[in-house]
Amino acid sequence: MENGSYLYAVEMSTPLGKRRGQLELIVWENFLNGYLTMFTRCFPIQNGKRSGNHISFQGEMKTIMKSLSYQAEGKIAGKKISLVLTTDSGSYQTTGFLTGEKGEPITNE
């Protein structure tokens, strides 16, 4: 994965069914930042790190009923992303794919 901005369409498996959203990752060297859009809201990701194709970050999601702090761990393989978001309420498998809208890396040329 090169430095740049990547947009993924993601789907999270929850006890109430699948939830769809977007994950924007901004990669610079071994650091990540960006946004997770889920439950019709956009949340910044924090403390993002990358080692090869393995990524990790944390953040907080807010639903109608509560706020959920999470730790995300996963990997990127080609155009696919696979994450596990771990919260105090359990772990949620999240998968997705690179979209064509912003999926091409932004270079500093």
Identify what each model region corresponds to:
Residues 1-77, 82-109:
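Central antiparallel beta-sheet cores of small beta-barrel/beta-sandwich binding domains
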